[in-house]
Structure formats: C-alpha cells, structure tokens
C-alpha cells in the first residue's frame, strides 16, 4: 500500500499540479485510511471492499470527524482507488457505490465596511512593518486573495502601471485581478521605499517580507491579522479568509456581476461564489427601510 500511495501522491502533484497544502491534506487522509486498514489486518489493496470502507467511515464518525472532513476523506480515497485501478495496481474500485455525505457550507464572519476601515487604519505607518502590514491588508481586501496566494506573490507579479496583480491560485492556475487607486498608492510606496529596507542582505523576490528579509509565512500573516483585529476591537473571528469573504460580499451587495466575482476569486465552480450572495443584516434593514411602505 505504501508504494501505491506514494505513486498516487506523485501523480497528483505532477499531473494535476496541486499545491503543497492540498497534497498534505491528501497525504493525511490516506494515512488515516492506511492506519485503519493495517489495524484491521488488511494487507493488500484487492482485499478492500465496500463494507470495509463503510466500517472505516463509521470509525471516523465515532472519532468525531465532521461531515465536511468525511466528504473530503471519501473524495481522497475514491480518487486513490480510481488511480490504482487505472494503473493496474488493483483489480477493482471498491468506492464505486460509496456515497459522499452532504454538508452545509458555512461562511465565516463578514466584516462591515466600518470594521474593514478600522482594521485597515490600525497599523502604524511610521514603522516599516506597520506600512507593510497596511499594504498587505489593503491588498487582501482589494483583491480577495487567499493567504497562500499572497505569500507566493513576487514583486514582478504586481503591475502598478497597468493596475493589476497576477495571482497563481489552486492548481497553479493564473488569474489577473484589478487593483484600485488606494492599494496602488500603498503598493508603490511599499515597493519603492519600505521593502528595500526590509530586504536587508537577501535577494528574494517575494513581495511581503518579514523583519529578517525573508518571505512572510502563512502563520505570520494569520498572527498579524489577528493582532490588528484585537487592536481594532473587532469582536469577530478574524482570519485572512475573513477579508476574502468580505471582499466578495461587499462587491455583490453593491451590484457586482457574479461571474466577474467568480473570476477574481479564482473559483472553478460558480456555486462556490454563490455562497456570497447571502445578504448581510445591515443590508436587509436598509432594503426594508427603503422599500417597505410601512417602514
């Protein structure tokens, strides 16, 4: 099994171009699967049948797996068994009749406009790291980028003259996202004045640098955003994805085209973007007051 799993992981990394984070999730799912099979003395892939998989799923449910995690686990092992059958490592695919559980997709908190402004205005612009943080927050809210996308950004991916940023999303898919005047202004000063001071002796092309001149990490960005959220007295769960959700929600609330928002977010399936068509409480109150004859 170990050999087949490694062959499969190599396949999805090379052939499908999946990110390291996605590969890591697949690897963790397959480790759970392999551990369960070994604990139950299943030594060969062709000994696995539908009943064994269902018992494995029952075990994961007993261990407290959420329906979302379970759905991803099933997707992983289904893809794995399809690969094994196609490459003749196995004589059958035992996942054929296994159903994927449905789960409710929940959005994290979305910031109101005044909360976004409070967050953006929190960094100290007199300090290099403060100016960097303001620029990064402006860019996250202006583009709806994922945290993994922003740490992969190089200086050359930002075209200030034409007003766009080139983003490499899931599966290394490239997309172009426009930039507004405000974020262009911050990016210009950051790239020309602040970043060279953060760069020190390093030669990295990464856009956002830590105080040692190296690329900001995923954990570093999460920590920065959480810290400013506390300073701005925002009583909501605040992550880089909160700004992404706020970006999409505010665009759609103000009449943006769903397809255009899908393109900017880098969603392959428009149903994912449609999650943002929920209307905020303040927007509901505004519409009620504006349109109800007895409001």
Swiss-Prot record:
It comes from the Bacteria. SUPFAM superfamilies: DNA breaking-rejoining enzymes. Residues 1-85 form the Core-binding (CB) domain. The active site is at 146, 170, 241, 244, 267, 276 (o-(3'-phospho-dna)-tyrosine intermediate). The keyword Heme does not apply. The keyword DNA-binding applies. It is found in: Cytoplasm. PROSITE patterns: CB, TYR_RECOMBINASE. GO terms for cellular component: cytoplasm. InterPro entries: CB (IPR044068), DNA_brk_join_enz (IPR011010), Integrase-like_cat_sf (IPR013762), Integrase_catalytic (IPR002104), Integrase_recombinase_N (IPR010998), Integrase_SAM-like_N (IPR004107), Recomb_XerD (IPR011932), Tyrosine_recombinase_XerC/XerD (IPR023009). GO terms for biological process: cell division; chromosome segregation; DNA transposition. Residues 106-289 form the Tyr recombinase domain. Gene3D superfamilies: 1.10.150.130, Intergrase catalytic core. Keywords: Cell cycle, Cell division, Chromosome partition, Cytoplasm, DNA integration, DNA recombination, DNA-binding. Its main location: cytoplasm. GO terms for molecular function: DNA binding; tyrosine-based site-specific recombinase activity. Forms a cyclic heterotetrameric complex composed of two molecules of XerC and two molecules of XerD. Site-specific tyrosine recombinase, which acts by catalyzing the cutting and rejoining of the recombining DNA molecules. The XerC-XerD complex is essential to convert dimers of the bacterial chromosome into monomers to permit their segregation at cell division. It also contributes to the segregational stability of plasmids. Belongs to the 'phage' integrase family. XerD subfamily. This is Tyrosine recombinase XerD. It comes from Staphylococcus epidermidis (strain ATCC 35984 / DSM 28319 / BCRC 17069 / CCUG 31568 / BM 3577 / RP62A).
